Amino acid sequence: MHNELPPVRRVVTENDKNGKSFFVSDGPPTSIREVAERPGYRVNNIWRTSASPALIKAADDIHTHQGIMPPKNGTVLRIIDYPPDPQDPLELKKQLDAMFSHLYKDAGHDLKEGEHPGMHITETVDYAIVLFGQMTAILESEETVLNAGDVLIQRGTNHAWTNRSGKPARIAFILIDGSNQE
């Protein structure tokens, strides 16, 4: 199945030497990741910051970003396109295992017996904004369906995403480096 969603457009602003604002880039993301074993799954890495407060004039280095985690004390913005999940549970597990091994080696992906194969933990606070379609957020004890316009705040929990809708879906994620220490 091909991706039926329109391409993501990334527009970046800047100030010139006189302080006048302009568009420094306008086009597709410079960092797009896909996994052959999961057709239609596309990660559009948009931007990242490496400090807080963020350095406004920091270089655009998103093309060097690897994994799921933001930089220490930083953030990462990505837009992910999700194909419908395959009906066969073994095929879904195969696809998700490939996704984690190729793209997200830094995610806590230590599955327990009976868990959804996409379960993972990150030490982050994530803002997940459903842009298109319908996705289901799965936790250890419950799940909920999210539609376009819904926002989920993920706070370091064991969780997974599944697309049971039969149609492509798109979510924007802002991951903020976090700590479980009080």
What are these language model-derived features?
Residues 72-75, 83, 143-147, 156-180:
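Ligand-binding loop in jelly-roll beta-barrel domains
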Residues 1-65:
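N-terminal leader/capping segments at the start of a protein or of a new domain
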Residues 45, 51-68, 76-82, 89-92, ...:
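Terminal, intrinsically disordered low-complexity segments enriched in charged/polar
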Residues 114-148:
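A short beta-strand-loop-beta hairpin characteristic of the jelly-roll/cupin
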Residues 4, 9-11, 15-16, 20-24, ...:
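Double-stranded beta-helix
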Residues 28-30, 78-122, 156-158:
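Conserved short histidine dyad/triad with adjacent acidic residue
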